[in-house]
């Protein structure tokens, strides 16, 4: 799939706009539906509008074995004409939490709902202060949102890159400087722990420095109708090497560090990296977030965002539930406070044992 067209999925938006009443217009390009469903701007009308757009456009009902009709019957009786704005927000937020999806948000003027259990119920496995203080002695460089340094071992050198957010644009020129500084290293650690995602274009930039030929990045589908299984055929996603004038990694082994805090674009990056032959994932399973978000608006003006276009990895597996590491390691909070990062230590040990001859 052409990358420009792929990125258009991320900008999808659907709005509830005034008509004779309040009309929900479901775009034909996304669901193949021409009908308009009217919802009134009252508590029950807003509930029905929200339930309906999720019913027609959300992409993970089957994977999560969700009975959306049963969920409607559970929450709709909680609402009547006397329901307050804050009460309605709480009920709608609780209903959306049934999706167990960190890409789902309900936004009102006074609050934004957010499903936190995808990361809050798991070990943190990371503390940046520990790395700064006990591993780098606060001696490192930072550019384009990436902090980088070199670890010296008895038998070689290991490059280290920490990228905390895909929301920060990675400049090609900045990445040239980083790759040049790490070029004589015998291995590379890319740390994306606690990276909650951001711009998909940064995946292209980073992966392009690690490959010599075009590689598959899995596939994406979009809704073609209101049914829960109405999807297009998969569109392939691919990644190309960086331009020849750019500085690329030297080909030595690479380790990607992950934890449950890796989500959305970081999760997609982990899926692509796991498919590369010279890359090993060490740490904990990522948080998931494998569906591109879709934006909409309720009759009362509240915004709703949710997963609408599912992404699968190179083997056809959904990435919504996270990417497993090749080597599972956890770093306890107590050890991190004491200055020990078991995940980083495991990565160094692995690379030292796999240094090129």
PLM-predicted stretches and their roles:
Residues 12, 22, 28, 103, ...:
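Intrinsically disordered, low-complexity regions
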Residues 32-223, 227-238, 295, 303, ...:
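Flexible, low-complexity junctional segments that flank or bridge functional domains
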Residues 6, 12-15, 131-143, 286:
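Short, solvent-exposed secondary-structure boundary motifs
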Residues 13, 17, 22-23, 187-188, ...:
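Generic hydrophobic-segment detector
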Residues 34-54, 86, 157, 196-357:
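C-terminal "post-core" interaction segments
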Residues 1-31:
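Sec-dependent bacterial lipoprotein signal peptides
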Residues 27, 182-184, 248:
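Alpha-helix termination/capping residues and helix-transition junctions
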Residues 9, 14-19, 128, 147, ...:
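Low-complexity, intrinsically disordered short peptide segments enriched in small/polar/basic residues
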């Amino acid at each position: 799939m052409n990358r420009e067209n792929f990125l258009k999925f991320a900008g999808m938006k659907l709005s509830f706009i005034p008509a004779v009443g309040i009309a929900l217009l479901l775009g034909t390009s996304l669901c193949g539906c021409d009908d308009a469903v009217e919802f009134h701007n009252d508590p029950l009308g807003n509930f029905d509008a929200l339930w309906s757009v999720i019913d027609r456009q959300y992409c993970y009902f089957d994977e999560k074995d969700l009975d959306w009709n049963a969920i409607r019957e559970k929450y709709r009786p909680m609402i009547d004409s006397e329901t307050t704005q804050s009460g309605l927000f709480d009920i709608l937020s609780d209903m959306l939490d049934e999706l167990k999806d960190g890409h789902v948000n309900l936004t009102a003027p006074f609050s934004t709902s957010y499903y936190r259990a995808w990361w809050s119920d798991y070990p943190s496995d990371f503390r940046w202060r520990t790395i700064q203080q006990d591993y780098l002695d606060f001696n490192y460089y930072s550019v384009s949102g990436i902090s980088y340094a070199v670890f010296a071992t008895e038998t070689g050198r290991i490059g280290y890159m920490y990228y905390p957010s895909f929301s920060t644009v990675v400049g090609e020129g900045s990445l040239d400087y980083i790759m040049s500084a790490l070029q004589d290293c015998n291995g590379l650690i890319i740390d994306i722990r606690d990276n909650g995602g951001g711009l998909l274009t940064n995946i292209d930039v980073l992966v392009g420095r690690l490959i010599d030929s075009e590689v598959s990045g899995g596939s994406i589908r979009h809704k073609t109708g209101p049914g829960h299984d109405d999807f297009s055929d998969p569109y392939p996603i691919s990644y190309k090497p960086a331009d020849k004038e750019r500085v690329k990694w030297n080909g030595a082994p690479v380790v990607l560090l992950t934890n449950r805090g890796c989500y959305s674009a970081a999760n997609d990056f982990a899926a692509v990296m796991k498919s590369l032959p010279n890359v090993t994932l060490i740490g904990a399973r990522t948080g998931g977030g494998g569906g591109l978000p879709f934006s909409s608006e309720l009759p009362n003006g509240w915004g709703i965002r949710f997963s609408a276009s599912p992404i699968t990895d190179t083997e056809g597996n959904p990435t919504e539930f996270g990417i497993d590491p090749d080597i599972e390691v956890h770093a306890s909070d107590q050890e991190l406070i004491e200055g020990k990062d078991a995940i980083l230590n495991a990565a160094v040990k692995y690379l030292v044992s796999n240094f090129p001859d």
